[in-house]
Design a protein with these regions (language model features):
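A short alpha-helical cap/connector motif
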Residues: 1-137, 144-164, 168-222
Length: 222
């Protein structure tokens, strides 16, 4: 492929990505949460991913959602904006500062305390205490212990529940086999596990830093 054609192709993809991100509108509280996240360096979802999360929640009519990786609350605000009146978000983070900032922004946004619970602790330990087959959607953001969190998702999800892994492609690093840092390896292995497991029907979407969406089929494997 001629270099100028490749250059135009790359430029076109960047333009499409930028347009997709700008399509999503963030309200004042989402913008404030994002600004807070930038100050503390929390890995929050992009506007495009946040809007996608809201879309999935609305489409699935999910009333029980687990978010692993609260961050500054950006993701939680998007999720809650799509949940029905009787829905509850359980959001988990290992950093107390993240949990505090997220709680503050939820309160500022006048979200009823009955709509969410924020849990702080070692992620895999907290997840292990959640009830079996009780959630319609699980969202995973961190790469640490990703394999174990995917396995726990089997247990947490109701039949035909959805798993979403945010930042699944590490903004392209996962697709590059020369990238051998721990995060890229963990995410690459996580995608492989889901792809090769017949219990999941999955797709990878190039929005934000990459999103993997998987439907738990709850089938008996011979």
């Amino acid at each position: 492929m001629a270099w100028f054609i490749l250059k135009d192709l790359i430029s076109g993809r960047r333009d499409m990505h930028a347009f997709a991100e700008s399509f999503a509108h963030e309200d004042y509280f989402m913008q404030q949460a994002r600004a807070n996240g930038e100050e503390i360096g929390s890995p929050d979802p992009t506007p495009g991913v946040g809007n996608f999360l809201k879309f999935v929640v609305q489409l699935s009519k999910a009333k029980s959602v687990v978010e692993i990786g609260t961050g500054s609350g950006v993701g939680g605000l998007w999720i809650l904006s799509g949940m029905p009146a009787d829905g509850v978000l359980t959001t988990i983070d290992s950093e107390r500062e993240h949990s505090k900032i997220a709680r503050n922004i939820f309160e500022e946004a006048d979200i009823p305390a009955t709509k969410y619970r924020i849990i702080t602790g070692k992620l895999i330990e907290v997840i292990g205490k959640l009830a079996d087959s009780s959630y319609e959607l699980v969202i995973i953001r961190p790469a640490l212990d990703l394999f174990d969190m995917i396995q726990e998702s089997y247990r947490l999800l109701k039949p035909n529940g959805l798993l979403i892994i945010d930042q699944a492609l590490s903004a392209g690093k996962v697709a590059d086999p020369t990238q051998r840092d721990p995060e890229s390896i963990a995410r690459r292995d996580g995608i492989k596990v889901i792809k090769e497991d017949e219990k999941w029907a999955a797709s990878v979407l190039p929005i934000g830093a990459g999103v993997l969406v998987a439907n738990y089929l709850n089938i008996a494997i011979r």
